[in-house]
């Protein structure tokens, strides 16, 4: 006669088995009280969101240009860059609406430095509370200069700490298909661009636009740090960002294909073109070539191109982050960027394209 095996007794615990440490995270409200938005920053953000809304809906024929470093790792260099970009933005204000790219979070294919919020000291100390404070202070300083800021929303909690200072947001190629990021975009107070998939697929971005325009209910954290259920009304100010895939998609054929896919889904064909990433075949200097092609399309009268994105820093190229070695000033530590001189020339090229588009429209 067989004896029935008794179940093994439960020993120990079943949760947090791979968590090595838990540290307190500052509540968003405490940081917002320590670094409150002032009237100057508020005016910059409000005006910029309204301007982007008008551009996306055809009421403003300027070209939105999101320009700046691949990622922020040095507040001082970022402010120096912002001062230069503010001057260029003022010079081209009639043709371009310039937003500074201020990216604090970096999606990684495997592992690596995850950005200024996650590791502000660049040493693996993960001083996230300090990173949040430094990020918010930098955004305040740039907005006070009258220059609006754009960022990528990657972590689902970080918007509670900085989103009131963001004029335009992006959802990256790796997260465009993520349901949680689509839900987040549906509740953000700023316009949002969704990149096409890493393989070049436009469909995932089109689906993201439709999802983000709809109401959602999801779990999140309030400004006071409490778990809560958020209900959104949907975001009408979302658009596609063409960043290339297996092949570039910045050219006229790529724009046409994306516009057709948007039209087939009943969506307006409003497109931003990322000059970097797969559109530049990961060669940062090709952004100049890509920009020239896009400027020609704009100059020929294409009104579907409403924005561009440029990875640019004080100095060109990139550098490795090596422990114990000083970093060169104003050089990216993530993707390589154009230097300032090439950036200034590229902005002039784009502004000229917008002026030509106006002439074409009046003929």
Residue ranges of model-derived segments:
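Active-site-facing alpha/beta catalytic cores
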Residues: 2, 9-15, 82, 95-250, ...
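N- or domain-start disorder-to-order transition segments that initiate the globular core
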Residues: 15-59
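Gly-rich Lys/Arg/Thr-decorated short loops/hinges at beta-loop-alpha junctions or inter-strand turns
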Residues: 27-36, 232-244, 327
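Acidic (Asp/Glu)-rich catalytic clusters
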Residues: 56-59, 86-93, 137-146, 231-232, ...
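Conserved phosphate/anionic-ligand binding catalytic regions in large, soluble enzymes, centered on
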Residues: 64-77, 335
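Conserved, mostly hydrophobic/aromatic
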Residues: 68, 273, 339
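A contiguous, surface-oriented mixed alpha/beta subdomain in the mid-to-C-terminal portion of proteins
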Residues: 239-245, 249, 257-272
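Internal helix-turn-beta structural module
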Residues: 313-359
